[in-house]
């Protein structure tokens, strides 16, 4: 199930990992954009923070961006299949919890309005 939005820390521009990314390479700003696109991809597709290799071009990324994101600790390698966004489970709703919340809301609406879910 997809999320209509993700949580994004307002202090992201000052995050030491983002600063290391931006200050550490001439293409660091582009890699930071890939990081944000990856978060929206994971939220939209309900991947719980997993970015499959085949999705990299869809989030405006290249292998060099993935390498930089891993080097600063924003992503972690997930074998040959892709990457995991570091800290996703701590700050974002899981796909499972989103589904449970949606079902509860449907049942509550049905009870309130007398409709079957």
Ranges and model annotations:
Residues 110-117:
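Charged, low-complexity alpha-helical linker segments
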Residues 104-109:
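Eukaryotic partner-binding/assembly regions in large regulatory complexes
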Residues 1-95, 99, 103, 115:
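Positively charged, structured surface patches that bind polyanionic biopolymers
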